[in-house]
Amino acid sequence: MDKRPNILWLCTDQQRWDTIHALGNSFIDTPNLDRLCRQGVAFTNTYCQNPICTPSRASFLTGRYPSSINANINGACNLPEHCTLITKRLADAGYYCGLVGKLHITSAWNDYEPRMDDGYSYFCYNLASGHHLNSPGNPYVEWLNQKGVDWHDIFTSDEKHDYHWY
């Protein structure tokens, strides 16, 4: 039996530690994140190396400062060839790595760039046209629709909803 730990690495852009109920925010409900905090590790004394999503992701996946790996703005990140992502190192060590969401660590500034050797065996990336939720084929909107929820109601209402996705 494999005794290596199972690693679930969640990245939520611009989310502070105090936006999770289990870590002290009594105003919101985050039951799934609360359960992860109870059963895993919650880092409550950490700092983000860059407030912009692409440089931040590139930094924590390479272990390097964004300025040292040409990851300074969104959409124009061209990592040097010598940079190896932690996911590639994990895959080389026998882990099965998967990505769901968006990564944005290869350049899309002028044209589509092929994926780097990132170590992901499963890669479910969808960036709906122009970051818009209502773009055709957006899996998140389709999932909401299957649940009988109109995303407009969630994002345009001042009401507190009883949706527990986080």
Spans of model-derived segments:
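Active-site segment of extracytoplasmic enzymes that catalyze sulfate/phosphate-ester chemistry
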Residues: 9-11, 17-100, 109, 118
